[in-house]
Amino acid sequence: MRLASKPTKGRTLDYAAPVYDLLEPLCLLSRQAEYDAAVFSALNPQPADRILDLGCGTGAQTQQVSLVLNPQLGGAITGIDAAGAMITAAREKRGSDRCFFEVMAAEKLDFPDRSFDAVMSSLFFHHIPLDLKRASLSEAYRVLKPGGTLVVADMDRPTTFMGGLVSHASRWLFFQPQIAENIRGVLPELMSEAGFTQPERLQHFFGYITVFRCRKEETR
């Protein structure tokens, strides 16, 4: 039975759930494995970590991270997405005793303060408008433990001609004005506004996707 989606101003991809596992690798062409490895390395998950994945889609990357977690030590990852069809598919394909999925909007997380050791997000923030970007990062900060890590991989200010061409074309082709905010390079500023340390730009892909990492300071 398909789960109901959560109301949100962000763009949900219920319609894409049946083919999402086929489409995502096409978007990253031949660099899917390299991209996944870069996100994993930035996150550096430990066996006892509790991790949150924002905008997890059908949970392929969520599941990859879960493989190093040990539920006997309390290790687990929870993927959230506002699209009920995505979470339905994720639970059916990839749910386990260390990999959980919930229908939830990133701007309104149903978790207590300081619940997670790390928060990750892959190609999610370009689907939501500026106010939800800001709210989602504030929520990520709230649910992170002091010293916790935030890893965001998403569209960023283009660094090459081709990157600029693809990112601007995507904005108009997919009718997503939210992409323009990413292209302007707003994500690092929004992370800092939310209270995180200065974001590091760890790796770039295709001239317009960046893997960011920042932290919640130990004293907060």
Q: For the regions a protein language model found, what residue spans apply to each?
A:
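Conserved class I S-adenosyl-L-methionine
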Residues: M1-N44, A60-Q64
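C-terminal alpha-helical "lid/dimerization" subdomain adjacent to the S-adenosyl-L-methionine
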Residues: A4-P7, V151-A194, Q198-V211
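Short glycine-centered segments of the SAM/dcSAM-binding site in methyltransferase folds
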Residues: R50, G147-T149
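Class I SAM-dependent methyltransferase SAM/SAH-binding core
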Residues: L52-K108
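A short acidic, Gly/Pro-enriched loop at the edge of an enzyme's catalytic core
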Residues: E107-V119
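A short SAM/SAH-binding and catalytic strip from SAM-dependent methyltransferases
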Residues: A118-D131
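A short glycine-rich, Lys/Arg-flanked "PGG" loop and its adjoining helix->strand segment in the class I
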Residues: R134-P146
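C-terminal lobe and adjacent flexible extensions of AdoMet/dcAdoMet transferase-like proteins
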Residues: F212-R220
